[in-house]
Amino acid sequence: MEYFGEFLGKYLFYIWLGLAILLFTFLITRGKKVLKQFVDIDFNKIVYSEKNASGHVVRQTQTRRAGTTKMLHIIITDQELIFKTNLFFAHIAHENDMLHRIPLGNIMQTEFKKGRFSSKLYVKFRTIHGDEKVVILQSKNNLRMQSILEQYI
């Protein structure tokens, strides 16, 4: 047992560093794979864009508790509503069902709710597979986003 303690004391930093590099590499490679769906965004047709928003999907028990906090990039083009995030957190956002490309014609309803400390925008939409989802967004300009999205409902 003494030998294990000496070994751990001597090599703990290198073990920790190796695990950190493995985790970092995993998140980057998975993030690149997940973000391939956003490669062809035409940035000349952006109507609205906001970084550092928060949100979560209300569909399953697991995703009600999980979401993204201050890492969501919301983009509205003339044809799509896009939720994406940066490379490092893309895998986590994908696992929490927060990466979407929604044609504006698939948006069914938006609802603005003013809270005590912040406001929330509920966006109900139909996925490509026909499922209905609701995303709750917390951003700086929820009313502006709602007015843009209401034009397409």
Predicted regions and their residues:
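Short, surface-exposed beta-strand/loop "edge" segments at domain boundaries and coil↔beta transitions
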Residues: H56, T63-R64, I82-F83, F89-I92, ...
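Short, mixed charged/polar active-site loops
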Residues: M71, E95-L99, G130-V134
